């Protein structure tokens, strides 16, 4: 992560609300085995800064594995924060719920669970119609068509 990108990480952390920060910490701690997560320590340290100063980070985490590939660590922290925000806001918008349903349907289709896929798509279709989300409805119809084509080819 370049210095400019480092400021993006700092800006992202500073933009988080108190509840978003708490959610990130809970989200991140689920993926930790054993001792404290280095990402959380870095997150907390950056959060306490008034301005981004990478030299202070290097001094604070001196001789710790966290700094071995620091640009990768910062990039992963940035991406983990975005993933946690995605999970945090997943149920807050109808569009997010519909895209989640489409994603689940795609997974079920790829696993060969066609009846379950069809059920998820039917539910998403009702929700999209009810909320007048016609662009997403077209994607749902596309996946339903894929199901019908698959059923046609597997019947022979």
Where are these regions (language model features)?
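Extended alpha-helical scaffold regions
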Residues: 1-156
